[in-house]
Curated annotation (Swiss-Prot):
InterPro entries: Bact_Sensor_His_Kinase, HAMP_dom, HATPase_C_sf, His_kinase_dom, HisK_dim/P_dom, HisK_dim/P_sf, Sig_transdc_His_kin-like_C
Residues modified as Phosphohistidine: H249
UniProt name for this protein: Heme sensor protein HssS
Alphabetical list of CDD domains matching this protein: HAMP (cd06225), HATPase (cd00075), HisKA (cd00082)
Membrane topology qualifier: Multi-pass membrane protein
GO molecular function: ATP binding; phosphorelay sensor kinase activity
Keyword Transport: no
Compartment(s): Cell membrane
SMART domains reported for this sequence: HAMP, HATPase_c, HisKA
Maturation and modification: Autophosphorylated.
Primary localization class, coarse: membrane
Residue intervals of the Histidine kinase domain: 246-456
One GO cellular component, as annotated: plasma membrane
């Protein structure tokens, strides 16, 4: 029954309307019983007494005609004589339920307040209860005989047009309300159905169909969030495809080269050529090994929930160790490396930070002009740790700088790197809640700046 949100909302709303109508009826019934019933009884009793006074003062001899006239004026009247013979005028009562004790009470000269004393019933409105006990009664004198006269207004006749009007109004109200509820429910459910279809497309890998924001309420916000999610998923999917293509290319190229070298090695070559081929194969295998290590490290960084950042990192020792390890490359290009390294302590992952700093220093050595200078600085300034590496090589155009940290990015085809070093470095710095940036110009060279919060 409630398999769809559309049905659920429609049934809930209709139930609320019907429940509200029932509660309103009960409230009105209670209000009539405790507030209006006595007033209604007194008003009808006053009318009946005025009728008796007029009957007495006018010396009406034809009682039948007089009460028939009152009945024609939309009153229901019952007259009981001393022998308990009952005569009715006006519209007939639905039931004759008055007790003999009530009749005797009136014949003895006491007034009867049946409307005021009508017992309370939850689902029956006493005002419309067309029974003889729901009347007021007083004695009349007719030819020296007492008559018990009971009267109530003919509600059905008096309010017949109003009841018709009220019934039409209620039917129209319920009909229009239910129609509008169904229509408004559909307008609410329609964008949700569209979102459902969109999620099914996303589930099947279709990230190209946009989700339009058709509203400005909570559902519109949901549409906006779904569209943002779709764009993010599309970006991730594009990156995944691009990543797979790049990995395939990076693996295929050295494998093709190795295959060609092995084919050459099988032919008749002299010892010098054989040694050269073996050396090239060794370089390609080393390249593949480094690529595999970097891919594994990237995978580890992308799923970093298991990583610990609780090492007490001694940056001065860490950077000094990297410089000592890279001394051969520095000497080979006859570079001058100047360092100004303060004693800075930091809580993080020592292995990853060593990798990030090593990548920056290795790049500075690799892309420096021979006989140039490299400047390495580390200091703490007002709670922020700064690590900068500057080299004097070819400047990096501003249009290229935003792409330096993309995975597999290479400035030119001759670059024999994997294009993953700076991407790895950026991921490591971000995991430590830091930032990395680059500036490059002819005067100052190229500077990579890493900033880390002292309290990580």
């Amino acid at each position: 029954m409630f398999k769809t949100l559309y049905t659920r909302i429609a049934i809930y709303t209709i139930t609320v309307i019907l429940f509200s109508a029932l509660v309103s009826f009960l409230f009105a019934n209670v209000y009539y019983h405790f507030n209006l019933k006595a007033h209604n009884d007194a008003k009808i009793m006053r009318t009946l007494k005025e009728a008796r006074a007029f009957h007495t003062s006018s010396n009406q001899s034809d009682t039948q005609s007089y009460f028939k006239h009152l009945g024609d004026m939309n009153y229901q009247i019952m007259i009981v004589d001393h022998s308990y013979h009952k005569t009715f005028f006006g519209e007939p009562f639905r039931k004759d339920t008055i007790s003999d004790s009530a009749i005797n009470q009136v014949l003895k000269g006491k007034a009867y307040h049946g409307i005021k004393n009508k017992p309370f019933e939850l689902f029956i409105t006493g005002f419309f209860d067309n029974e003889t006990d729901n009347t007021v009664g007083i004695p009349f004198n007719q030819n020296n005989q007492k008559l018990a006269v009971f009267m109530r207004p003919d509600i059905g006749e008096t309010f017949s047009e109003f009841r018709t009007f009220l019934a039409v109004l209620l039917i129209c109200l319920l009909g229009i309300s239910i129609t509008l509820v169904i229509a408004s429910t559909y307008s609410i459910i329609k964008p949700i159905k569209i979102l459902k279809q969109a999620t099914e497309r996303l589930m099947h890998g279709d990230f190209n169909s946009p989700i339009y924001q058709s509203r400005h309420d909570e559902i519109g916000t949901l549409q906006y969030r779904f569209e943002a999610m779709r764009q993010s998923l599309k970006q991730v999917d594009d990156m995944r495809q691009h990543f797979v293509q790049n990995v395939s290319h990076e693996i295929k190229t050295p494998l093709t080269h190795i295959h060609r070298l092995l084919s050459t090695l099988q032919s008749n070559v002299n010892q010098g050529e054989r040694d050269q081929i073996i050396h090239e194969i060794h370089e390609e295998v080393t390249h593949l090994s480094n690529l595999t290590k970097e891919l594994l490290l990237l995978s580890e960084l992308d799923n970093a929930t298991h990583l610990k950042f609780e090492d007490d990192v001694h940056f001065k020792e860490l950077i000094t160790d990297i410089i000592r390890h890279e001394q051969y490359g520095i000497d080979n290009k006859q570079l001058m490396l100047m360092s100004d390294i303060d004693t800075v302590h930091f809580r993080g992952n020592n292995r990853l930070l060593h990798q990030a700093c090593s990548n920056l220093i290795q790049n500075a050595i690799k892309y420096s002009n021979p006989n140039s200078m490299i400047d390495v600085n580390l200091f703490n300034n007002e709670g922020t740790i700064y690590f900068t590496v500057t080299n004097e090589g070819h400047t990096i155009p501003e249009s290229v700088q935003p792409h330096l940290f993309d995975r597999f990015y290479k400035r030119n085809a001759e670059d024999n790197s994997n294009g993953l070093g700076l991407a790895i470095t950026q991921s490591i710095i971000h995991l430590h809640r830091g930032q990395i940036s680059v500036t490059s110009n002819d005067r100052d060279g190229t500077t990579f700046t890493v900033t880390l919060p002292e309290t990580n």
